Every structure is written in C-alpha cells, then in structure tokens.
Amino acid sequence: MDGIKYAVFTDKGIRLLGNNQYTSNVESGSTRTEIKHWVELFFGVKVIAMNSHRLPGKGRRMGPIMGHTMHYRRMIITLQPGYSIPPLRKKRT
C-alpha cells in the first residue's frame, strides 16, 4: 500500500461510514486510478466512486523563521453495496 497513508476518522468521516464511504489520507502524488487499484487489490472490494481534495499544510514557526508542513490529499472512497472495509485496528481490552 504505497499510496494510502492512514484512515481518517473525523465527524464527517464517521458520518460517511453509514453511506458505505471511507475516508483516508493518501500521498499527494498518487492518482485516483492508482488508489482505486490499491484499495480493490488490498481489501478485495469494488470501488464505484472516488472523490478527492487537497488540504493545505499548516504554518510552523521555528524561532524567527516561519516554515510550513507539506500539503496532503484526502480521498473519499465509495464502495458498492454489500462490500465493506474491515476495521484497521482492534480495540484493546
């Protein structure tokens, strides 16, 4: 899984789980077709739609110098009905 960094569980991301949509951050150089191929190959699901947007980096101050973090890309992946992605981590007991 070279392009997918991690799953995102924000308020909107949790709400979209009910619509069989999964949110994850991916590398900014990855294309939609690459991400679709990786998701279908790794999880064994069928992807019907993909939406993406680029999020800006945040400003970071290091003494008198103002720097910034890198921007990143977020993908919203819609799966066919009947398919789902299992949780990435189990809850500790």
Curated annotation (Swiss-Prot):
InterPro entries: Nucleotide-bd_a/b_plait_sf, Ribosomal_uL23-like, Ribosomal_uL23/eL15/eS24_sf, Ribosomal_uL23_CS
Gene3D superfamilies: 3.30.70.330
Gene Ontology cellular-component annotations: chloroplast; ribonucleoprotein complex; ribosome
Matches recorded under Pfam families: Ribosomal_L23
Keywords from the named record: Chloroplast, Plastid, Ribonucleoprotein, Ribosomal protein, RNA-binding, rRNA-binding
Name used for this protein in its record: Large ribosomal subunit protein uL23cz/uL23cy
Location of the protein in the cell: Plastid, Chloroplast
Main localisation: plastid
Function description: Binds to 23S rRNA.
Name of encoding gene: rpl23-A
Subunit structure: Part of the 50S ribosomal subunit.
Similarity field: Belongs to the universal ribosomal protein uL23 family.
GO biological processes: translation
GO molecular function: rRNA binding; structural constituent of ribosome
PANTHER family documented for this protein: 60S RIBOSOMAL PROTEIN L23A
